[in-house]
Amino acid sequence: MSRASLEKNPHDVASMFDAVAKRYDLTNTVLSLGQDRFWRRETKSALRIGPADKVLDLAAGTAVSTVELAKSGAWCVAADFSVGMLAAGASRQVPKVAGDATRLPFADEVFDAVTISFGLRNVVDHKAGLREMARVTKPGGRLVVCEFSTPTNRLFSTVYKEYLMKALPAMATAVSSNPEAYVYLAESIRAWPTQAELARQIGEAGWSDVRWRNLTGGIVALHAATKPA
């Protein structure tokens, strides 16, 4: 799948991530110019978790993000619908579960916090995914969505879009096992809702106290919310 589409085929998306799994972590670090580590730390900080918490890390991929979250002392589980990605992270000592974000294999209200980083764009129905995250979260629990977004500075936004559509695919050809996946990445970012629109959608999915802030000039946005008690 090389074109971004709001009608994503789950099998195609899972297969695409299976294909990039082996070099996924290295590719992310190279293409983000090392910012991926900063984004993971900021996500953990925004989630406000501690040793008593149970945390779901959705679209966790190779579980790099789950390991970062587990440094808080919380019990953290990595979930992803790409079996290849989970297998690539087999050496990381955190629980792993294969599952679809729109039909999570968990009971109601079991997690104190749920997070998804750079995965909501790839969910076939991301609004349904947001509702599922609310279902498995305890009343008063927390949500943090870390996702690519829209730079707010017009000049920076123009430069960034040029990077997405030209430089990023070229760099991916050099370091990725499936460069076509990064063409999809670039196009899916351009098709994604703005920060304000995503905040509205999170609220409509049953979350309250929705707020967001930009990282790296708006290349990434952190949206945080709470499940009503």
Curated annotation (Swiss-Prot):
Record's keyword terms, sorted: Menaquinone biosynthesis, Methyltransferase, S-adenosyl-L-methionine, Transferase
NCBIfam families recorded: MenG_MenH_UbiE, PRK00216.1-2
Gene source species: Mycolicibacterium smegmatis (strain ATCC 700084 / mc(2)155)
Single Gene Ontology BP annotation: menaquinone biosynthetic process
One Pfam family, short name: Ubie_methyltran
Function: Methyltransferase required for the conversion of demethylmenaquinol (DMKH2) to menaquinol (MKH2).
Keyword S-adenosyl-L-methionine listed: yes
Protein name: Demethylmenaquinone methyltransferase
Enzyme class, first EC level, given as a word: transferase
Disulfide cross-links: none
Gene: menG
InterPro entries, sorted: SAM-dependent_MTases_sf, UbiE/COQ5_MeTrFase, UbiE/COQ5_MeTrFase_CS
Top-level lineage group: Bacteria
Family under the similarity heading: Belongs to the class I-like SAM-binding methyltransferase superfamily. MenG/UbiE family.
Binding site residues for S-adenosyl-L-methionine: 62, 80, 100-101, 117
Catalysed reactions, semicolon-separated: a 2-demethylmenaquinol + S-adenosyl-L-methionine = a menaquinol + S-adenosyl-L-homocysteine + H(+)
Molecular function GO labels: demethylmenaquinone methyltransferase activity
Database matches in PROSITE patterns: SAM_MT_UBIE, UBIE_1, UBIE_2
Keyword presence, Methyltransferase: yes
EC id: 2.1.1.163
Pathway: Quinol/quinone metabolism; menaquinone biosynthesis; menaquinol from 1,4-dihydroxy-2-naphthoate: step 2/2
